[in-house]
């Protein structure tokens, strides 16, 4: 026998020992006991000494059971079959032990034991517990109930693939049903109902075979004379409703509705309350299934809400809340009545005279059903009106969150009522009233900058203006409450004001006196917990960020002392929050980009003393250390010129923190703040020591430290310049070549920026490192992934190298280094390097030419020669043309005369890369000399139709690079030429023409944009689609002066969605998608008219499907596929930027259609469905049974025999995308209760291929960011 088995055996022997009087032998030798057994032993010793030995001590069994509990909780324990049987038998016997302590320990052992024994032993445990529940002994029944709950809670969930939980639950369901049905013993009924509720909440769907019997067993219990039974039955029915079949749900709903009497019919108040409470429970657990029954339910519930019964009113309002949250679409006709009832009962307080100043303290307990509530909860002496008011407030919050489209009405009706109710005397109710108003604020928050939203004549702007009018009323209502003795009230005020300031920045400035008074009151409140001080500090910090600095100036003498006291607070969280506030105060009141309007002299000493005291302390929490360092950085950076003799000690303290490994990162950031300060402080006392320390940080693996260090070094180099000690600078420069690498582009960019600054301030220091740095930099330029920021930094560095006097590196040497990899290429197998590398090298050549204009003409001439030489390789020609595109504009007219001929010849090159580079150069060079080049370019487009595509590309570049004023003389000629080519049969040509038209419109938008009307009305189909495509190129993601004019024409352009031509409709959808994605404000107000047309384009049109014969095979072609795909892409973009304007139920109808469409569209809709599951869980839940079927069909689809590899890969990707949507749906616990989802989940677990795929997707979701967005424009 192993040591573990022997130990278990010895424990079992002790657990079965008979009771004895206490003796030293019962201690089990000299083993060390846990604290709990020692307490038992101490009590036993006391009784024994006193002579009372009749008590059942049972110490050996108790201690052995405790030891067994410890063993079972170890992962390493393994029981053989014999040990399993003995342990189970012994523990079940101990459940009947005379000692209550032994019983309690034994039942606790059952939890960990479940995972250590075989299934049949678990079933044995469950059988015994069920039998004990029917025992005549009350204590045994209680312990059996606890045991069953313990076992059920420890069973592995069905989602893990284990069938144990399901088999155990099926085994006991029948016994629970019979226990509930028998009326003799209420205690057994209650215990069985509790266990059944727990089972249904965890494993409702897998118990489908029992649902009918459970329903028929539970429904009669709604009429039980015992309140506790009725309440537990209501909870169980709620869980059952979420998991049962549609037929059973309809039966349950019909039962509840049919038994609701008419409001004037005689009925038991208790029976009505129970039925309404059951409706509320079903609404909370399965409200998405109640939508079809609401038209019958709501009139009855509304009538009952008017009866003189506060408990019934509360239940009705709770039911309304559930209905609003779970089926908002179906509640639409009932919203006015619900709103009226909420307004009526939110002020329902018949037992209180509001004119009195005396506030009554009342018990505030949760009214939600739970098994702990007792039958006498609703005593005649209880004032239930506060629960009615709280239910009304919660219902109002649900109303606001479920119907954001009614915000204007809510601001007129709900907002004033909520503000009046801020004086509510009951704290729980007041918290929910605050919550409802905060919900209104959050939905009023505009989706973009608030200032633009206020000025915009849309509904959002009107909502914000209505909110602004409410601010004085809110302030008046909350003025006294900011100093309320109740902490929770003040916290609610701070939360509400924080949200208000975030929605409407600046609106609290004129009320600052009241707010500061309230903040100071809470900061000085040491009688309550520190939480209120932290809340007050957090509110103050937010206020400093949203309100103008001038509003704080008069209040600083009042505000600063309590903040300083909090900085010195012994509790680290308060101190950390106070330091953050102090930092914000400094940054807001004495900004560096504006003149000082407030003299800092009276305050700077106090702030410096308090902060440095925190910084010098050595026993601080890490968060306080970091905040103190940051605060010192802001203090020195903003007010260093007023610190006087304290400046140098403060800098030395920062230097000391720079040496400490724990504080070095915040110290580096603080040093950066000091260095970038326009105060130009003298940092000489620390520079010689700080630079080598910073240099050492560049070798660390901590990326954040390297980035912060490079930023600090660049700031120091810019601010101190020649003041930096050259030896220290060289020590830093020695670390830089290793950082100029494509391994981390951001680090490389900062390193090059620092090199540029050093080159400009201390060029002599670069002598030793310029070679290695240039070598790494040139290697970096060969990366095809080079970001624009790194390229711009490289250009600046190269310009700095040739800009010093004398230059650090000669111009010719740098040009040679840049072009050598291309010029030295052996053979002519094509360009060689990646296309993007040529553009990067060309940009650098142009940057050098711009820095040395005297060299530009010579460089351009050499490039022209290289471009026209028959001996030049393709790579050399491409680089020459791309360089000429950049250099030609600054090279002067000399080389340009010869350049025309060279570029035109190159358009006929056999190399596509050379032709594209020549076209690009022709346009860019022409932009610098429009009078000479543009007429020539237009003439060539007319004369050379075979080169038209390349010449149009050149025209596009010229229009994009030239100044608008310089283009005005040529507008009419270019316009005419472009519209002559709108009917080109080549789609690529039409697309380039559209882009040219878009760029041309920017020259004179008010004159040219209205011309589109004529073209759309009279043009041919190709012309109309080209015009609409051109509109797409007028939309950018940045604000532009054309936006207001464009917005006035959008409605007319969108009428093209009704164009009979497919290409025009597709172009219109593409343009609409670009607008929604980049500038949704252009189309938001038109969605009511656009969406029906958009949805129409998602339908499959049979008249557009045709068969094409390809040899012996027939191939189906769907001409409408591209239009449908464009429509679904628009729908996805609308989810991201216009969610509030969508009717999600209607939206889901078309998503549902897309789930059965073509491969490309299904891929789109799977992504949309995953997004909707996160954004709009309630509507998705309502139709999950319909959504899951196409997903199941996709996941279980079989590939046809003989399919090619491409088909197999497409099917695998489709299956993976569908499974991602399934995984996203299943993140909602309520979705998992759906019978159809539970059935599919079982199917996934039983199929090894699907199970593996599902597990891999879940791991991917857990380890990486989800696909929250998709670029479609």
UniProtKB/Swiss-Prot annotation:
GO biological process: protein ubiquitination; SCF complex assembly
Superkingdom of origin: Eukaryota
InterPro entries reported for this sequence: ARM-like, ARM-type_fold, CAND1/CAND2, HEAT, TATA-bd_TIP120
Positions of modified residues (N-acetylserine): 2
Ranges annotated as biased composition (Acidic residues): 356-383
Keyword terms of this UniProt record: Acetylation, Nucleus, Repeat, Ubl conjugation, Ubl conjugation pathway
Tissue specificity as recorded in UniProt: Detected in heart and skeletal muscle.
Region (Disordered): 352-383
Repeat region (HEAT), residues: 2-36, 37-74, 82-119, 121-157, 167-205, 209-246, 248-284, 292-329, 364-405, 409-446, 469-506, 554-591, 602-641, 685-722, 727-764, 768-807, 809-850, 894-931, 933-968, 970-1003, 1004-1040, 1044-1081, 1085-1121, 1142-1178, 1194-1231, 1241-1273
Assigned GO CC terms: cytosol; nucleus
Subcellular localization(s) per the UniProt record: Nucleus
GO molecular function: TBP-class protein binding
Post-translation changes: Ubiquitinated and targeted for proteasomal degradation.
Keyword Repeat: yes
Biological role stated in the UniProt entry: Probable assembly factor of SCF (SKP1-CUL1-F-box protein) E3 ubiquitin ligase complexes that promotes the exchange of the substrate-recognition F-box subunit in SCF complexes, thereby playing a key role in the cellular repertoire of SCF complexes.
Family in the record: Belongs to the CAND family.
Subunit structure, interactors included: Binds TBP, CNOT3 and UBE3C.
Designated name of the protein: Cullin-associated NEDD8-dissociated protein 2
Organism whose genome encodes this protein: Rattus norvegicus
